[in-house]
From Swiss-Prot:
Entry's EC annotation: 5.4.99.27
Organism per entry: Haemophilus influenzae (strain PittEE)
Active-site residues, record numbering mapped to chain: 80
SUPFAM superfamilies for this protein: Pseudouridine synthase
UniProt KW tRNA processing keyword: yes
Keyword Transmembrane appears in the UniProt entry: no
Enzyme class: isomerase
Protein name: tRNA pseudouridine synthase D
TRUD domain mapped to chain residues: 155-311
GO molecular function: RNA binding; tRNA pseudouridine(13) synthase activity
PANTHER family to which the protein is assigned, alphabetical: TRNA PSEUDOURIDINE SYNTHASE D
Record GO biological process: tRNA pseudouridine synthesis
Gene: truD
Family note: Belongs to the pseudouridine synthase TruD family.
Described function: Responsible for synthesis of pseudouridine from uracil-13 in transfer RNAs.
């Protein structure tokens, strides 16, 4: 699925090979909520370091230890299992003593901070993540250095990667079967997964089409552009001066976007409209599920992007906003295999 999508850097697949996540410590993720814990309130907040652990599994164990229902447990986002990850959990415990979490024991889990907070940490309440990644076996070369410089200066395609589609693209397959009336999906979580897979596939195909046409740094008629640093967007229609918008794009004041389809999707550039219309089979589902259309930046530029060649391979450090995938960046640099 992802292997069929075009590359932005050098317009060709990377020549360098590497191992990703050969060890958990090769993939370190630290969550950034964008706000501090209040220090008081009815929620116990726990900052946890996990090694080779599933987010939901750890959350369930924390809730059980505290004697509260799993429904009273919250977190901002799921993290990779085969990794070392740090993230916040919360447990709703109004009028209850904070448990002695020094007695909590679970292989691969270390509780770094215990405090209180006045609001539940909800899924999606995440600003971004810091990454520290070792690409084992990646050897220094001129080609790889060019790719590193390109990603640092121009960014990478903001593709959704394999996690979004399920094992062997199962979620996308099921979304299509659902849309074609072959199956009924009663489970709410499965409906959400399948809808997300369909929207992600169409987004990826629009990005791929723009790369293929050399239109990743060009404002086209009817493009929908986003103000940098915000979630506000507007349409580059006949009321807008395309030349002026092009200058703003080059100054990074605005960003090009691609669609996350929904029941109220707007017509956009010809490139985008063609892809969306080819997947109209999903339109009834979007209306049925009252899915709101949204926009997502076409390209993403990592903040604080740095690299160093070590004995074991290439180490990358960078920050990405919530919703962008580190593996989408990595695939622009190396042909990686996951252990």
């Amino acid at each position: 699925m992802l292997e069929q999508l075009p590359y932005l850097a050098l317009k060709t697949p990377p020549k360098t090979t590497a191992l990703l996540k050969a060890e958990c410590a090769d993939f370190i993720v630290k969550e950034h909520l964008g706000y501090e814990m209040s220090g008081d309130g009815e929620f116990v907040a726990l900052y946890v370091r996990k090694t080779d652990c599933n987010t939901l599994f750890v959350g369930e164990k924390l809730a059980k230890f505290a004697g509260v229902s799993e429904r009273n447990m919250g977190y901002a986002g799921l993290k990779d299992r085969r990794a070392v990850t740090e993230q916040w959990f919360c447990l709703q415990m109004p009028g209850m003593e904070t448990p002695d979490f020094s007695q909590f024991e679970l292989d691969g889990v270390e509780i770094l901070t215990v405090t209180r907070h006045n609001r539940k940490i909800r899924t999606g309440s995440l600003e971004g993540n810091y990454f520290d990644i070792l690409l084992r076996g990646a050897e220094e070369s001129d080609e790889l250095k060019v790719r590193l410089d390109f990603v640092a200066n121009f960014g990478f395609p903001n593709y959704f990667t394999e996690q979004r589609f399920g094992r062997e693209g199962h979620n996308l397959t099921q979304a299509l079967r659902w849309a074609q009336g072959e199956i009924k999906v009663k489970d709410r979580k499965k409906r959400s997964f399948y809808l997300s897979a369909a929207r992600s596939e169409i987004f990826n195909l629009v990005v791929a089409a723009r790369i293929a046409k050399g239109a990743t740094n060009q404002v086209l008629p009817n493009d929908i552009v986003q103000l940098a640093g915000s979630h506000s967007w507007f349409k580059a229609d006949e009321k807008e001066d395309l030349n002026a918008l092009q200058v703003r794009l080059e100054n990074q004041d605005i960003l090009l976007t691609a669609p996350l389809i929904g029941e109220d999707i707007l017509a956009a550039s010809d490139i985008e409209n063609e892809i969306v219309n080819q997947h109209s089979v999903f339109d009834p589902l979007m209306k049925q599920e009252r899915m709101k259309a949204a926009r997502r930046p076409l390209l993403m530029k990592a903040k604080g992007f740095s690299w160093a060649f070590e004995l074991e391979g290439l180490r990358l450090k960078f920050y990405l906003p919530a919703g962008s995938y580190a593996t989408a960046l990595v695939r622009e640099l190396v042909n990686y295999t996951e252990e």
